[in-house]
């Protein structure tokens, strides 16, 4: 009986060791930043059944990085990375930026799908304005070699920007129907938060948390 107990104890300890090893491996894997352009087909989030990959997220990552970098250069033009590492409101600026990029993508996906159901499209004037915005954004992105670092092509960025423009247009329509200001339905707006609760989304943390915001299109 003693031998049986000893054998069972050995088995239990072995199983626990395996579990601990798997946990340690997964934890280490979660802490490792990914090389963005090597993971473009990885799913970052699912919104109402629609999967958005890192390729789909590229525009939002670049947009947020460039916006925050402007603030970083004002804070310390000689060492902008210092700003990205500031800890404020309980988290680092780079973490806040990563969350903002994801929130914008989810927001646009929701409003874009709503727009499609209502057959909302851009007018010729809106398409022309979008075309100019796309060219400006691509120029700025290329200026920092961002597209190469992201691993995306012009069509990927333009597609996301068109989707965002349509989403924004429907956001304005939706806000008007609700007698609200368009900003109430921005991704941080109070009324949008209530709308968000009616939608299903799941962020793939094992992928998204490994995106090193501040160092994807930028070199710090």
PLM regions and their residue ranges:
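Short, low-structural-confidence N-terminal segments
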Residues: 1-93, 190-220
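Alpha-helical transmembrane segments
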Residues: 20-23, 104, 119-120
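A generic secondary-structure micro-motif detector
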Residues: 35, 100-101, 133
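Charged, solvent-exposed helices and adjacent loops that form client-binding or oligomerization surfaces
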Residues: 66-97, 116-190
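Active-site SXXK
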Residues: 103-116
């Amino acid at each position: 009986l003693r031998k049986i107990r000893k054998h069972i104890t050995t088995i239990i300890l072995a199983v626990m060791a395996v579990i601990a090893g798997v946990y340690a491996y997964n934890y280490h894997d979660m802490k490792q930043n990914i090389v963005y352009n090597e993971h473009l087909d990885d799913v970052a989030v699912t919104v109402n059944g629609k999967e958005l990959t890192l390729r789909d997220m590229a525009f939002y990552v670049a947009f947020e990085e460039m916006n925050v970098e402007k603030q970083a250069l004002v804070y310390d033009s000689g060492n902008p990375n210092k700003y990205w590492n500031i800890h404020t409101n309980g988290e680092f600026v780079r973490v806040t930026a990563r969350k903002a990029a994801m929130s914008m993508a989810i927001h646009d996906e929701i409003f874009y799908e709503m727009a499609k159901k209502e057959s909302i499209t851009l007018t010729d004037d809106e398409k022309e304005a979008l075309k100019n915005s796309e060219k400006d954004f691509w120029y700025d992105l290329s200026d920092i070699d961002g597209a190469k670092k992201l691993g995306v092509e012009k069509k990927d960025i333009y597609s996301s920007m068109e989707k965002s423009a349509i989403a924004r247009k429907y956001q304005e329509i939706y806000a008007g129907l609700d007698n609200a200001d368009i900003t109430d339905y921005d991704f941080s707006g109070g009324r949008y938060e209530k709308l968000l609760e009616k939608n299903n989304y799941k962020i793939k943390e094992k992928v998204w948390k490994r995106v090193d915001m501040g160092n994807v299109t930028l070199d710090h």
